[in-house]
Swiss-Prot record:
Protein name per its UniProtKB record: Ig heavy chain V-III region A4
Domain Ig-like: 1-113
Further remarks about this protein from its record: This chain was isolated from a myeloma protein that binds inulin.
Species, as recorded: Mus musculus (Mouse)
Molecular function via GO: antigen binding
Disulfide bonds: 22-98
Any one biological process term the GO annotation gives: immunoglobulin mediated immune response
InterPro entries in alphabetical order: Ig-like_dom, Ig-like_dom_sf, Ig-like_fold, Ig_sub, Ig_V-set, IgHV
UniProt keywords, alphabetically: Adaptive immunity, Disulfide bond, Immunity, Immunoglobulin
Domain of life assignment: Eukaryota
GO cellular component, one term: immunoglobulin complex
Amino acid sequence: EVKLEESGGGLVQPGGSMKLSCVASGFTFSNYWMNWVRQSPEKGLEWVAEIRLKSHNYATHYAESVKGRFTISRDDSKSSVYLQMNNLRAEDTGIYYCTTGFAYWGQGTLVTV
């Protein structure tokens, strides 16, 4: 059974920082690109960041709205992906999900700024 379990959400002041984590199981994590996606009533579903494989030198890509503020990383030995979020803004409020190539999704973690 595939599982993606996010954690680390909560309430943070504008300008603050927060780190989200996602632990995967049930598939070969190191073979999958990983993404963070967020959902809010105002913007709907919004892709945030992507990290590719070791063979791609763990290349990363970001939505323009978070570039320079958010950092995605992964630890294949722990089947985990992370999202470090700095200088948070009210518009960053939403439910954050980790996903593979959008085939598998976690249950989400709520971030409120």
